[in-house]
C-alpha cells in the first residue's frame, strides 16, 4: 500500500514539476536560447546545404542548347531537302485516334464496372431474385409466343461522341473486339463488388 501511494505521489509530483518548468521558460535569455537553438541551427544548416547542392546538381543536369536529332543527321548525309512525309503524319493521326478510342474504352469499362459492382453488392439478394424471376418470366412468355426477343433490333439510346453503347456493351462483353472495355469492366466490377460490403 505504501509503495503504490509513493508511486502515485511521485507521478503527481513529477507532473506538477513539469507544469511549473514549462510555464516559466525564459526563451529570451542567452543561455537558454543558445541551448535550444543549436539543434535547430544544425538542421536548418544541413537543409540549406542540401537545397544548394540540389540546385547545383539540377543546374548542371539542364538540357543543353544543342538539339541531338538523329533524323536531322541522316538528312544532312543524304544532302536532300527536309520535307515531311504525308503517309507518316496520317499514320500518326490514326495511331492517336486509336489511342483515344482505347482510353474511352478503358474509361467506360471502369465506370460501368464500378457502378454495376456497387449496385450488385449493395442489393445483391434482391437483384438476384428479381433477375432470376424476370428471366424465367421472359422465357415463359417467349415460350408461349407472346413476346419475341431479338437483340439485333435493340437501338442504343445514349450516344457519347462517336461511341455506340449498345455495340460497346453487347459486343464488348461477349466479343473480343473491345478488350480494353472488357478488362477494365471486369476489374472494376470485381473490386467494387468486393469493397462495397466491407
From Swiss-Prot:
What GO cellular component entries does it have? mitochondrial outer membrane; mitochondrion
Give a GO biological-process term: mitochondrion organization
Give the matching InterPro entries.
FUN14
- Give the membrane topology: Multi-pass membrane protein
Any coiled-coil ranges, and where?
none
* Keywords noted in UniProt: Membrane, Transmembrane, Transmembrane helix
Family, as annotated: Belongs to the FUN14 family.
Protein name, UniProt field: Protein FUN14
Lineage from the top down? Eukaryota, Fungi, Dikarya, Ascomycota, Saccharomycotina
**Gene that encodes it:** FUN14
